[in-house]
From Swiss-Prot:
Recorded GO CC terms: cytosolic large ribosomal subunit
Annotated family: Belongs to the bacterial ribosomal protein bL12 family.
Keywords linked to the UniProt accession: Ribonucleoprotein, Ribosomal protein
Organism taxonomic ancestry: Bacteria, Pseudomonadati, Pseudomonadota, Gammaproteobacteria, Thiotrichales
UniProt organism field: Hydrogenovibrio crunogenus (strain DSM 25203 / XCL-2) (Thiomicrospira crunogena)
Annotated protein name in UniProt: Large ribosomal subunit protein bL12
HAMAP family: Ribosomal_bL12
Gene behind the chain: rplL
Quaternary organization: Homodimer. Part of the ribosomal stalk of the 50S ribosomal subunit. Forms a multimeric L10(L12)X complex, where L10 forms an elongated spine to which 2 to 4 L12 dimers bind in a sequential fashion. Binds GTP-bound translation factors.
InterPro entries from the UniProt entry: Ribosomal_bL12, Ribosomal_bL12_C, Ribosomal_bL12_C/ClpS-like, Ribosomal_bL12_oligo, Ribosomal_bL12_oligo_N_sf
Amino acid sequence: MAITKDDILEAVANMSVMEVVELVEAMEEKFGVSAAAVAVAGPAGDAGAAGEEQTEFDVVLTGAGDNKVAAIKAVRGATGLGLKEAKSAVESAPFTLKEGVSKEEAETLANELKEAGIEVEVK
């Protein structure tokens, strides 16, 4: 019996974040591709939409800085990730630590991580 797309989607839905990251890395190696997002230009026009303030932000770890151990500890403390997940996140930068958080929460997390010497972006 052949595996269907639904079977694959169900298997991925039951994976942890780290398992999905490992799956993506394995697929990149197997097929010689990159899973990096392609930048797409937004629709032209509507000047009113450009004035709207962003309400949800992503906190992205862009670099571990000089002290990798301190970076892993800071990521664990700030996100609640386990040791293995935090280590993988630090080593695979850029890595999105939090998605869809408020501006205040994103800035607080970013400042906490920057104090530990980690390079962080709020998008």
